[in-house]
């Protein structure tokens, strides 16, 4: 492996990386040996409410130093199964959305060309679009999307097409996602109108609102998700505002009435068997995370995703 017990010593003092893993950049001689790369995208130019997700990767890195090497339920030891490394951050251009997206896509094209599966920490949810432009290189893929919002609006504020509320509308239009293999879970909160839901229905996206989420057994619900997604390539996108703000207050657009922190982990554990080619965890906003609980939950969700990806 490219690491040597880095993730087993929670008190090791070093430059912060995700889960104390080695930092392996694209010019590193062992870049091509990496199986799963953890990547930060410190960019929130798509934010329309409370800013701050650009600081998410650094805060989640710090929180992740207390993530240990073994899964508490499955016993999975991901760092012994695959070569996993922190690939560093993508350098965005905070003054130019399109240049930033191009930079992100180019970075991920390099990652994908090396055969590395990316696990991303944002950043706001617009981050997912340029990542998908690189990940869905062979054609449209499926997606499991945990969020309190659909992020399917056509535009915000006088026609702005690229915000954290529009990435998956663009992804469907650009043929990056197969809408009939997209499931959105946890949708709730007040709405401007029904445009996003109408679009979802018109293209075949399955929306599981929070009312249905709480009425059904999670294992049963996630079995339906696995049936919809099938065994083809899929992406997992996790907005931390999927979780109730009691447990995850540090986010830009919180919505009350959401899942608790255990349910936040449980839904990822139920992704077993999916062909996951990439994943992201976005919208952690440290300025609103006074206790650090949101960042630690985000780091824990990352570890759950990682355990699914090593067995994918």
Provide a role label for each language-model segment.
Residues 157-161, 249-257:
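Short glycine-enriched, charge-decorated loop/helix-capping segments at active-site entrances
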Residues 145, 255-269:
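Gly/Ser/Thr-rich active-site loops/lids in small-molecule metabolic enzymes
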Residues 172-248:
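Active-site rim beta-loop-alpha module in soluble metabolic enzymes
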Residues 23-120, 125, 188:
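N-terminal catalytic or cofactor-binding beta/alpha core of small enzyme domains
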Residues 103, 108-109, 113-181:
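Active-site histidine-anchored catalytic micro-motif
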């Amino acid at each position: 492996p490219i690491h040597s017990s880095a993730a087993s010593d929670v008190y090791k003092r070093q430059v912060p990386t995700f889960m104390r893993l080695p930092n392996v950049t694209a010019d590193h001689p062992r870049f091509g040996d990496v199986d799963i790369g953890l990547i930060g995208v410190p960019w929130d130019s798509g934010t329309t409410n409370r800013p701050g997700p650009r600081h998410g990767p650094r805060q989640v890195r710090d929180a992740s130093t207390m993530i240990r090497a073994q899964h508490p339920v499955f016993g999975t030891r991901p760092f012994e199964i695959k070569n996993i490394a922190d690939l560093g951050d993508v350098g965005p251009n905070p003054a130019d959305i399109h240049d930033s997206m191009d930079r992100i896509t180019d970075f991920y094209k390099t990652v994908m060309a090396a055969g590395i599966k990316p696990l991303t920490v944002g950043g706001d949810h617009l981050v997912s679009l340029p990542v998908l432009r690189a990940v869905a290189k062979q054609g449209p893929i499926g997606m499991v999307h945990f969020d309190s919002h659909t992020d399917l609006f056509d535009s915000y504020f006088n026609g702005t097409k690229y915000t954290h509320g529009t990435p998956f509308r663009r992804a469907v239009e650009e043929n990056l996602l197969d809408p009939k293999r997209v499931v959105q879970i946890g949708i709730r909160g007040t709405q401007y109108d029904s445009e996003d839901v109408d679009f979802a229905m018109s293209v075949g996206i399955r929306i599981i609102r929070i009312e249905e989420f709480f009425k059904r057994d999670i294992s049963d619900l996630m079995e339906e998700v696995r049936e919809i997604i099938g065994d083809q390539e899929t992406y997992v996108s996790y907005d931390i505002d999927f979780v109730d703000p009691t447990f995850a207050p540090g986010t830009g657009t919180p919505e009350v009435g959401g899942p608790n922190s255990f349910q936040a982990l449980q839904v990822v554990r139920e992704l077993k068997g999916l062909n996951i080619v990439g994943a992201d965890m976005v919208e952690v906003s440290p300025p609103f995370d006074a206790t650090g609980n949101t960042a630690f939950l985000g780091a824990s969700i990352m570890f759950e995703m990682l355990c699914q990806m090593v067995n994918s």
